[in-house]
């Protein structure tokens, strides 16, 4: 029973001591601090009085020399002498550009100097010689920079780069897509087939126009070759094939050869019977 009561008695004695926890703690000692120790401030130089012309005593503090800068990356600055060309690389690129930043940058160089034949008084003294910044090392000039300069009278641009060559006249081993040649070949075949179809259609229409004119001429020629018959009432009456009565003929029948010369014409014969064509029974 006593073992169960002693924790309650201990808690009742410690409960009035809880306000002591709110008291501020004392600052830590300097020796026990884990933070780095700051260097002490430099002592000021002694105060010097002003000159005798000063109206009152003025305390002039002498200026301390500026701290020396630690040279991390030494940069050699070149002095440009009069009459010489500026350096090919701008300031800060003498030792080469950094390898991790902008490896594709183009460094523009100077113009053509007097030694190369350039005229500083002219409007165009020369070309800007450019180079490509390599990731490790100095900037390299363009390989065709010498061929791009002019001879004096005109400008010679040199050979055009391979990317500007036409694809039809360039070499086949330069990475030209073979599908381009297939497309051009198919297009030419389609144009030729369409042209042949158009010519065939025009030829058929011209032949159809010539056939009706030829048929009409043949019919006219056949009609002119058929014999003519006299169907006048005074002429000969044509009976059918089953007729019993004989065919009446006129009293004076002209011979088939027509009237002979020197023979008198019969009296009472009509004038149209002289040139009558003989009848042909079909």
Swiss-Prot record:
<comment type="function">
    <text>Acts as a ligand for PILRA in neural tissues, where it may be involved in immune regulation.</text>
</comment>
<dbReference type="GO" id="GO:0098793">
    <property type="term" value="C:presynapse"/>
</dbReference>
<feature type="compositionally biased region" description="Low complexity">
    <location>
        <begin position="46"/>
        <end position="56"/>
    </location>
</feature>
<feature type="topological domain" description="Cytoplasmic">
    <location>
        <begin position="200"/>
        <end position="282"/>
    </location>
</feature>
<keyword id="KW-0472">Membrane</keyword>
<dbReference type="GO" id="GO:0050776">
    <property type="term" value="P:regulation of immune response"/>
</dbReference>
<dbReference type="GO" id="GO:0048872">
    <property type="term" value="P:homeostasis of number of cells"/>
</dbReference>
<dbReference type="GO" id="GO:0019904">
    <property type="term" value="F:protein domain specific binding"/>
</dbReference>
<dbReference type="GO" id="GO:0016323">
    <property type="term" value="C:basolateral plasma membrane"/>
</dbReference>
<dbReference type="GO" id="GO:0016020">
    <property type="term" value="C:membrane"/>
</dbReference>
<keyword id="KW-1133">Transmembrane helix</keyword>
<dbReference type="Pfam" id="PF15298">
    <property type="entry name" value="AJAP1_PANP_C"/>
</dbReference>
<feature type="compositionally biased region" description="Polar residues">
    <location>
        <begin position="213"/>
        <end position="229"/>
    </location>
</feature>
<dbReference type="GO" id="GO:0021542">
    <property type="term" value="P:dentate gyrus development"/>
</dbReference>
<keyword id="KW-0812">Transmembrane</keyword>
<dbReference type="GO" id="GO:0008542">
    <property type="term" value="P:visual learning"/>
</dbReference>
<feature type="region of interest" description="Disordered">
    <location>
        <begin position="28"/>
        <end position="99"/>
    </location>
</feature>
<dbReference type="GO" id="GO:0010467">
    <property type="term" value="P:gene expression"/>
</dbReference>
<feature type="glycosylation site" description="O-linked (GalNAc...) threonine">
    <location>
        <position position="140"/>
    </location>
</feature>
<feature type="transmembrane region" description="Helical">
    <location>
        <begin position="179"/>
        <end position="199"/>
    </location>
</feature>
<dbReference type="GO" id="GO:0006950">
    <property type="term" value="P:response to stress"/>
</dbReference>
<protein>
    <recommendedName>
        <fullName>PILR alpha-associated neural protein</fullName>
    </recommendedName>
</protein>
<feature type="signal peptide">
    <location>
        <begin position="1"/>
        <end position="31"/>
    </location>
</feature>
<keyword id="KW-0732">Signal</keyword>
<dbReference type="GO" id="GO:0007214">
    <property type="term" value="P:gamma-aminobutyric acid signaling pathway"/>
</dbReference>
<dbReference type="GO" id="GO:0021549">
    <property type="term" value="P:cerebellum development"/>
</dbReference>
<feature type="topological domain" description="Extracellular">
    <location>
        <begin position="32"/>
        <end position="178"/>
    </location>
</feature>
<dbReference type="InterPro" id="IPR029198">
    <property type="entry name" value="AJAP1_PANP_C"/>
</dbReference>
<dbReference type="GO" id="GO:0014047">
    <property type="term" value="P:glutamate secretion"/>
</dbReference>
<dbReference type="GO" id="GO:0005886">
    <property type="term" value="C:plasma membrane"/>
</dbReference>
<dbReference type="GO" id="GO:0035176">
    <property type="term" value="P:social behavior"/>
</dbReference>
<dbReference type="InterPro" id="IPR039628">
    <property type="entry name" value="PIANP"/>
</dbReference>
<keyword id="KW-0325">Glycoprotein</keyword>
<feature type="region of interest" description="Disordered">
    <location>
        <begin position="209"/>
        <end position="282"/>
    </location>
</feature>
